[in-house]
Amino acid sequence: MIELNKKHYEYEGSIPDYFEKVVLEENNLEPPGKKSLGDAYLDERTAVDVKTINVNGDFHMGNLASQDKIRKWLEDKQNSLMFFFIEYEEDCGVVAINSTKLKHIEEIHPDCLQISAQGLGVMQLKNWDKVEFISKMNRDEWFKDVYAPLLKEFISKEEKKLEKLRLVYDSYKD
């Protein structure tokens, strides 16, 4: 279990970076390597990524992680990926914690996820304000019913963009 010890924090620098450090320190967790999927590990098989949400902010669509990293990590059924969501309000260098939630990726409602065009695709929350959680899905079901359809939709969009780009390229040939 991951928790925050206080309701208010004075911070310096970026709030997401600050809370990644706070979560590690307050829960006696070791930082992972630079290329790791999560910001912390509960054990060698449970990656936890810290996600901060400013409830007074205008933009609430958060990147979760590269879809490729997620797939590679979760293909090993012994591995788990969790997100520690921290909802907060900020005022003059002080952050007030509204709520925290520790959830497996398989607990995020499928309608709340998308894969967007960054690199090989990044899995995102469509809108934190409308995110819903469900009972944890079986891993095989999650891959079949959530991941595969999202990836298919992403690939289709990318193919359409590339086809338009190909037409531009073809107009300059010859």
Predicted regions and their residues:
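Nucleic-acid endonuclease domains
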Residues: M1-D174
